[in-house]
Structures are given as structure tokens and as C-alpha cells.
């Protein structure tokens, strides 16, 4: 449960996927669209189709990798500031308007100060609540902002990880901080 966005102490489910598929489409694309409805990710691995969801991780139980676990050197990267957003317009299906698309917006003043006003637009597939659409827009903006990426290769201990696995990485080049 998450706050319902109306103030007070009301809560609602984090995601409700409320969709009616009305046309034929490529199965892989339909599954990817469904996974997008809960911030999921699809991938093909080990000769099976896999879906993982974006869920909060218990940071006290994360596996910590160190440079000793890495073959070669880790490579850090992130996107350009030119591609940073400070707000989002989100289309969602409004049940009060016969499920016609309606647009809602989110904006983050701290990011506007840092990157100026840059807007992205997205469609929240299967979303029928404005509060959920705003959360999805906020997730899109902040995940775009917090995009430090590390690329690394491991030995056999790397078999424990699949795409979407959350882990910590301790690198002495960052003064012993864990990222």
C-alpha cells in the first residue's frame, strides 16, 4: 500500500492493472506492455521467458560485491544532463470519462532548478487512477535522474544474478561508500 495522493492517511495499492486488450498485437509486445504496468522488465534467459518486477529491496540483506569479485575493471557511466527531465505529462484512462485518455502532470522543483524545465511524456498502460499515473511519472523522472550505471564482469558468483537484481557494490575509489 502507498499513500493515495489525496492528503491524509488514505492508502491504495501501489499498482492496479486495469486493461482491456481490444486489438491483435505481437505477443512479445503485449507482455512487455503488461510488465510496464508494474514497472516490470522482461528478458529471455536460460531458454526461458522471464519477468521481474520493480519492488523495494531490503537493503539490509543485499549481496555486496567488491572489486575482488570483478573480472577486469568496472565501468561507470550515466546519461547526459541534456537528457535529464524535471517534469512529466502522463496519459491514463479516466473511468470518470468513459475510460478516455486524460493527462496529468508531475513536476519536481529541485530538478527544475538543476536542469531547467524539461518535460517527458508517457502513457501509463492499464492505469485508471490519477494518483498512480503521477507515481509512474515521478518514477520515470527520478529513475532518469538517478541513473548511475555500472558495467562489470564477474566469475562464477555472477550466476546468482539476473537482470533486475539489486546488489550493492563497494569500490574503494569512492572512499569505501557502497553504491
Residue spans for each PLM region:
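C-terminal extracytoplasmic interaction modules
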Residues: 1-179
Amino acid at each position: 500500500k502507498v499513500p493515495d495522493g489525496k492528503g491524509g492517511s488514505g492508502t491504495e495499492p501501489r499498482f492496479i492493472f486495469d486493461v482491456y486488450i481490444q486489438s491483435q498485437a505481437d505477443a512479445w509486445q503485449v507482455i512487455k506492455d503488461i510488465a510496464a504496468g508494474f514497472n516490470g522488465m522482461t528478458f529471455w534467459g536460460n531458454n526461458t521467458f522471464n519477468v521481474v518486477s520493480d519492488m523495494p529491496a531490503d537493503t539490509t540483506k543485499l549481496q555486496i560485491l567488491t572489486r575482488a569479485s570483478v573480472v577486469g575493471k568496472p565501468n561507470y557511466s550515466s546519461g547526459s544532463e541534456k537528457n535529464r527531465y524535471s517534469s512529466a505529462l502522463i496519459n491514463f484512462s479516466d473511468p470518470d470519462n468513459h475510460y478516455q485518455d486524460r493527462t496529468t502532470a508531475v513536476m519536481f522543483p529541485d530538478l527544475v532548478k538543476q536542469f531547467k524545465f524539461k518535460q517527458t511524456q508517457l502513457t501509463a498502460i492499464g492505469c485508471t487512477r490519477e494518483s498512480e499515473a503521477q507515481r509512474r511519472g515521478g518514477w520515470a523522472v527520478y529513475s532518469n535522474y538517478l541513473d548511475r550505471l555500472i558495467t562489470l564482469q564477474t566469475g562464477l558468483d555472477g550466476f546468482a544474478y539476473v537482470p533486475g537484481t539489486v546488489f550493492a557494490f563497494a569500490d574503494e575509489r569512492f572512499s569505501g561508500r557502497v553504491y
